[in-house]
Design a protein with these regions (language model features):
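C-terminal structural segments of small proteins and small subunits
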Residues: 62-90
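Short S/T/G/P-rich N-terminal loop/turn motif that feeds into the first structured element of a domain
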Residues: 1-54, 58-70, 93-97
Length: 97
């Protein structure tokens, strides 16, 4: 079943975060992931939630998503993300076809 990583991002260093985005994309692709949402307009419809930025990644399954998160190619970009933004991240399983 497909799996989705959903990330809420509060950017604290915009210049550094742009570099992170440049480095993160190839690692996502190497693990079969693709960006479903990468920033863009975000509007709160219910509740008290006002994210600055949302990213949604799709992977083949939950295991593959975790492999990407912990892969050597993403180690340095991941550290960069931690330095340039405050993030909250969840992994959810999608529906089968």
């Amino acid at each position: 079943m497909p799996a989705y990583i959903i990330v809420e991002i509060d950017i604290t260093d915009p210049v550094g975060y742009e570099e992170y985005k440049r480095l993160a994309g190839p690692a996502v692709a190497n693990y079969g992931g693709k960006y479903i949402v990468r920033g863009g307009a975000c509007e709160t419809l219910e509740g008290d939630w006002h994210p600055q930025r949302i990213v949604v990644l799709q992977f083949e399954n939950m295991e593959r998503a975790k492999e990407w998160l912990n892969c050597p190619e993403y180690a340095e970009p991941r550290k960069m993300r931690h330095r340039t933004a405050k993030t909250r991240m969840i992994l959810v399983e999608g529906l089968s076809s």
